[in-house]
A protein has these predicted regions:
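Activity-critical C-terminal alpha-helical subdomain
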Residues: 91, 344-395
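Alpha-helix capping/hinge segments and adjacent helical runs
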Residues: 327-339, 363-364, 368-372
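Conserved, mostly hydrophobic/aromatic
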Residues: 117, 299, 367
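Short beta-alpha connecting loops at secondary-structure transitions
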Residues: 18-21, 139, 306-308, 341-348
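FAD-binding subdomain of flavoenzyme oxidoreductases
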Residues: 11-167, 372, 388-395
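C-terminal substrate-recognition/cap domain of FAD-linked oxidoreductases
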Residues: 127-131, 137-142, 148-321, 325, ...
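Short coil/turn segments at secondary-structure boundaries
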Residues: 49-51, 229-231, 374-377
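Glycine-rich loop at the start of a catalytic domain that most often binds anionic cofactors/ligands
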Residues: 1-5, 180
Length: 395
């Protein structure tokens, strides 16, 4: 047995501090609700997963969520100043200070963010805000070649531009969305293999236009097709809907396994090629899309017509190959979705036994009884290592 905590009723925006550009919230606040509340005061909270209309700040903190704007602004952890946390023994502590700078002691705040509920329960958060950009420009860039599209990503940054979003969608990703999601429409040439969705933001329209011209030049150097510029708010929302609903289209209409690989952005073309090569050998198809600007590629592996026995036996081997290659490129297992239970068997690919044992020691110092999300994140310890916690929660 166990106790499940639902914090969705702790949904108060406690204070919006316009002078210090901070907001204090409870964990049950919906991310989009927070964004809209601070936007009404000319402020901006950039971290926004695709599920921002339903996900909560507490969940974002637990996973260190990212989203499309991470490429320019950073992930959730980069916007957290201070946390109120209930520890497993019932003690209530604040982890930091409501300041932009803090060089005092160990950084407990950054340790709690992304810990997936294994160290404590977040009951309040002080988050950093930035001024709301006054202008945005958005373009959808098609390519006949997936590798060219991926190579264009790093080239944009080399040209001196930092987009507020730079998203990748292979042809299958868009086809799934157009097939299964109502109210999404875009014209796609028969020979188009991939798209980049590129957004820039700022306060001066003339500067953004120059940025768009630079980006367009980069795209043309990588043999893009005709670029679609979103001229109105409705057109922008339509293009974003096309990107945001890919995951929903795949997950609602297939048996799938999603990976959240992330690599240095220059390695994105090689990672995509490896995913397709592994799929061809094992007999599965994949739908790939994600936050290309920061190298975060979502890989949805589709069961399709594979027999259940093949799917269950071969899928873990295929995933291990993909993860091993990802790490060899300088990447890691998850950019923003976390580890939980499902990815736990692959942690040995990213971390040495010494690193994993260090993490277990941290877990044990916070939660010696192993009551906080037992069994999550860390694989079971081998004999001879710090194992008190693992012995307590081993099935």
């Amino acid at each position: 047995g166990g106790v499940g905590l639902a914090l969705d009723r702790m949904n108060t925006i406690v204070d919006i501090d316009e002078l210090n550009l901070q907001v204090t919230v409870e964990p049950g606040v919906i991310t989009q609700v927070l964004q809209e509340a601070v936007a009404a005061k000319g402020l901006y909270y950039p971290p926004a997963p695709g599920s921002r209309g339903s996900c909560t700040i507490g969940g974002n903190l637990a996973e260190n969520a990212g989203g499309p704007r991470a490429v320019k602004y950073g992930v959730t952890r980069d916007f957290v100043l201070n946390l109120e946390v209930v520890l497993p023994d019932g003690e209530v502590v604040w982890t930091g200070a409501n300041t932009l700078k803090n060089a005092t002691g160990y950084d407990l705040t950054r340790l709690i963010v992304g810990s997936e509920g294994t160290l404590g329960i977040i009951t309040r958060a002080v988050l950093r805000l930035v001024p709301l950009p006054k202008e945005t420009r958005l373009m959808l860039v098609p390519f006949r070649d997936e590798r060219k599209a991926c190579e264009a990503v790093a080239a944009v940054f080399r040209a001196g531009i930092t987009p507020s979003a730079l998203e990748f969608m292979e042809r299958d990703a868009i086809d799934w969305t157009l097939r299964y999601v109502q109210g999404v429409s875009v014209s796609i040439a028969d020979d188009t293999k991939a798209h980049l969705l590129v957004e820039v933001d700022g306060n001066h329209a003339d500067v953004l236009m120059r940025d768009c011209e630079t980006i367009l030049g980069v795209m043309e150097q990588h043999d893009c097709q005709e670029v679609l510029f979103a001229e109105t708010a409705a057109e922008k929302e339509g293009l974003w809907k096309l990107r945001r609903r890919v995951g929903e289209a795949v997950k609602s209409n297939s048996v799938y396994k999603e990976e959240d690989t992330v690599v240095p952005r220059h390695a994105l073309p090689d990672l995509l090629a490896k995913v397709k090569e592994v799929g061809a050998r094992y007999g599965f198809k994949s739908v790939c899309y994600g936050h290309a600007g920061d190298g975060n590629l979502h890989v949805n592996i589709i069961k399709g017509d594979l027999a259940d026995t093949v799917w269950q036996h071969d899928l873990p081997k295929a995933i291990r190959e993909i993860f091993t290659y990802t790490v060899s490129l300088g990447g890691t297992l998850s950019g923003e979705h976390g580890i939980g239970l499902v990815q736990r068997p692959y942690m040995d690919i990213a971390f040495s036994p010494v690193q994993l044992d260090l993490m277990r020691r941290i877990k044990n110092s916070f939660d010696p009884q192993g009551i906080m999300n037992p069994g999550k994140v860390l694989p079971y310890a081998p004999p001879g290592t710090l194992c008190q916690l693992e012995l307590q929660i081993r099935p």
